[in-house]
Amino acid sequence: MNLVPVDTDTHFAHLQQRLANADAAVRRVALVEFADVEDESLLPAIAAMLRRDPDPTLRAEAARALAGWGDGDVVDALADALCDAPQVRSAAALALTELKDPVAGERLVHRTRHTDAFVCAAVLRALRELRIAAAAEPASAALRHADAVVRREAIGVLGWLRHAPALPDLARRAQADADAEVRCAAVGALGLAAAEQAAAVLPALCAALRDAAWQVREEAATTLGKVAQARPLRAVACAALREAMEDDYWQVRLRAARSLGRLRDAEALPVLIEALAHRAGNLRKEAAIALGEVGDTRALAALSAASADPDPEVRKASRLAVQRLS
């Protein structure tokens, strides 16, 4: 059987011509073919399509097709598209999050100061996991942005960078930002505090355990277990976490129990044993695990009783805790 060799160059030349065809249906099929072959030589044509195609649906498709490519012109085209029609800018914003090359991401840093809040937020989101040091200063400035989404994305950048100079601003946001999601993000970012900085963020985290939004309290309970490992801080953190075991939301109690176990707080024995009888199985399971981590044999009787819990996960956690304490 004789196979006729395919002229790849000719095929790509035809594909490039079809990307600029007057018929939108032809251009759409060409875009689909590009997604299959992913030939780098076609990137300029796709970028041009993103910039100039009259059909916003196709511009959005072009943005999706460019996701993950770190070519400079592609990054610029996607960033420019953040000012396009809603469906295009959304596709471009998502495509930018797939950047993997920090060098390509550096082309975006100056756009964090754009006057459009959507652009600022999208660029900060794209920069987050790239961990570009140059993004720290504009992200810190963006903590004061009027738009809550921008502030939240700025916190994400600073958290991924583990940018210690931002801790005081993050502590203030954790307590006083008007938006609950921003407060929650700031509380989580305070977990980046190193041991020598933990004392400075502890008051903000304890205050966050009394936040009006239960999601913020939940995040605070988790973060306290991470940063309060040092003995001088542990007593303060554990006292606040024991109070959180009375929270109206079992989700907050669950995280508090987890942190109390992590901090091995023997004074938490009564509240953890009480949690073994809570209606939420997930909390009962976490309380059993925490009691095993605390390591106090006074919990053996309660854990033995919990080994007959109707929830199999609680039974398993309780039996493992009993083995650990025996």
Residue spans for each PLM region:
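Short inter-helical turns and helix N-cap capping residues of alpha-solenoid HEAT/ARM repeat scaffolds
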Residues: 22-23, 54-55, 84-86, 115-116, ...
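N-terminal alpha-helical scaffold/docking segments in eukaryotic complex subunits
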Residues: 1-60, 64, 68, 308, ...
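Core solenoid repeat modules with strong leucine/isoleucine-rich periodicity
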Residues: 87, 117, 122, 148-149, ...
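Amphipathic alpha-helical scaffolding segments comprising HEAT/armadillo-like alpha-solenoid repeats
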Residues: 6-18, 39-52, 71-83, 101-113, ...
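Ankyrin-repeat and related helical/solenoid repeat scaffolds used for protein-protein interactions
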Residues: 250, 254-317
